[in-house]
Amino acid sequence: MVNIYNDINALEATFRKTPEFEALQAAVEVVKSDEEALNVFKNFRKIQIELQKKQLAGEELLEDELVYAQKASQLVQQNEKISAMLEAEMKLSKVIEEVNRILIKPIQGLYEDIQ
């Protein structure tokens, strides 16, 4: 019997060695070492999470919440360190998407003859 978890753990170790992961790791450290950037990012994440919770609960987002979120987003975009971190995260996300596409390929193959 195949133990897929051994392979996944090996993949996780390899994933940590990719240039994309290492770039994100370095970018996160840069943000963490800058108190202002860190506070701006923490506030932005807090707002994002609060708005997502409200949306998932089916609650309507208030205009002032959206304006506040937009202002927080602008602060994030204006901070070069945070922008670099988010750009590194997006590059890493592309790697994750590609891995996911490869993992899903066998499932897609199962359904090809059904169409």
UniProtKB/Swiss-Prot annotation:
One Pfam family in the UniProt entry: Com_YlbF
TM spans (from-to): none
InterPro entries: Com_YlbF, YheA/YmcA-like_dom_sf
Family: Belongs to the UPF0342 family.
Protein name per UniProt: UPF0342 protein Bsph_0375
Record lineage: Bacteria, Bacillati, Bacillota, Bacilli, Bacillales
